[in-house]
Amino acid sequence: MEFKVIAEYFDKLEKISSRLQLTALLADLLSKSDKAIIDKVVYIIQGKLWPDFLGYPELGIGEKFLIKAISIATNTDENSVENLYKSIGDLGEVARRLKSKQQSTGILGFLGTSSKESLKVDEVYSTLSKVALTTGEGSRDLKIRLLAGLLKKADPLEAKFLVRFVEGRLRVGIGDATVLDAMAIAFGGGQSASEIVERAYNLRADLGNIAKIIVEKGIEALKTLKPEVGIPIRPMLAERLSNPEEILKKVGGSALVDYKYDGERAQIHKKDDKIFIFSRRLENITSQYPDVVEYISKYTEGKEFIIEGEIVAVDPESGEMRSFQELMHRKRKSDIYEAIKEYPVNVFLFDLMYYEDVDYTTKPLEVRRKLLESIVKPNDYVKIAHHIQVNNIEDLKSFFYRAISEGGEGVMVKAIGKDAIYQAGARGWLWIKLKRDYQSEMADTVDLVVVGGFYGKGKRGGKISSLLMAAYNPKTDTFESVCKVASGFSDEQLDELQKKLMEIKRDIKHPRVNSKMEPDIWVEPVYVAEIIGAEITISPLHTCCQDVVEKDAGLSIRFPRFIRWRDDKSPEDATTTDEILEMYNKQPKKKIESPPIDESV
């Protein structure tokens, strides 16, 4: 299969703003792809060489070295490449222009013919894999030579998307949900197969692996798919409410209640003597927690399992829980073994999804928890999450206050009926989080995605000083604007923000972004931030839940304030539009709705 095919489709995808058109075009590309390398094609579409959970290195080519590779490939002076880049702001477009110029001025371009062999997807994939995996002395020069070799063979359009791929900036607007829908259309006979494909992906979060199974065994093979140790399961997510009485009613009157820990959620896989740890974002974080690997090996029973818990920093003297920030301090230390001494951790387990070749995601919580409790040996490091079974408001409140007093964020209230399965990749009312109220009318913080930026005035003139934030709509796989946040940033954070945003700047709005507001710059929906505000209000300026509460208006956050970046969350993990609507419906209503506030004022 020629790489040119992918490049031509990327060129078309980049110009589309409709998700339906995006999905249809992507389905067309998949159906025309070589089935033998369909997994590689899918990874390239995702802008990666392999799934994040494998923990393999990324390409590791910086701007400076890309400029050098383009210079070598196009026989152009490095300064000229750099000046053109400063003028255009897109290295991929720089490569395309220089390759076009090279072709038109060469003798082959004059004759209107070419003798070079076409660039194959396999060659691109294997060469870029070498670039990523090459280490040691002289590795930088080798990486540049390998990349320059590919760019020499590439035509202008191929060069454009090769460079963007290496930069990690494909800009074609494709999310995992769009790829899933396209796979259902291309290989499953239509959109009706989407649920089957999505379920498989939720159990094995590897789109390339799912695509390979479909083309080799057919869509029916996905119906019996089980979790596989080494491939993370997409985590089950909780809804949120701030009223204990309403929570208990939602889960059927009785529930299992766990502490909600202020730590890092971890999915732990074991097969024989191999142990893997995956983050909430399904990244391989095993190397960050050699102590946890040791604890799981020593204090759990079973040859093969997938379990879930929270890694929490604890005081080395008292054993009391420390905050999430302490865990972040540990991660920043270069000497991991020194970090283990300074910031020890405990693991609090709360679920079991797979054990000895049996899929437990379809079994009720009580069955899963009972088995989980039976495989943990008595010890001081790996424990079952603090929990209680409740059937009345008083016990729920009492346990909630106890959790807060012991350093927790609140509690997770979990349904215990026969239908209380593990809903991989889904957010539902089987789990509901109850967190302490903030000193604000909003009952909880929200996690929103940056989709644009606005330049400041006065001392902040010339700098991006406020952000257009969006909530995630999983039904449409889009990001709907919900507020413009300008407060809460330190000067240092603002300086860091300029670089962050310029790296993901776009010329036009991302096709997955739904916004009436026009920021000064559009960006890729990559970064997630935790935001607090005074209340959720109706606003004609924003598209979150457009026309749901009031015609021609959406929902917005009044007086939003930045709290922190949520690097542990992907854009699709952000607060959903339905959650924003739920929070709006649950907040105390005034007799007259406050008039919409323009956050830019």
Curated annotation (Swiss-Prot):
Residues 568-601 are annotated as: Disordered. Its cofactor is Mg(2+). CDD domains: Adenylation_DNA_ligase_Arch_LigB, OBF_DNA_ligase_I. InterPro entries: ATP-dep_DNA_ligase, DNA_ligae_ATP-dep_bac/arc, DNA_ligase_ATP-dep, DNA_ligase_ATP-dep_C, DNA_ligase_ATP-dep_cent, DNA_ligase_ATP-dep_CS, DNA_ligase_ATP-dep_N, DNA_ligase_N_sf. It is an enzyme of class 6 (ligase). Its EC number is 6.5.1.1. It comes from the Archaea. One of its GO terms (biological process) is DNA biosynthetic process. DNA ligase that seals nicks in double-stranded DNA during DNA replication, DNA recombination and DNA repair. Belongs to the ATP-dependent DNA ligase family. This is DNA ligase. It comes from Saccharolobus islandicus (strain Y.G.57.14 / Yellowstone #1) (Sulfolobus islandicus).
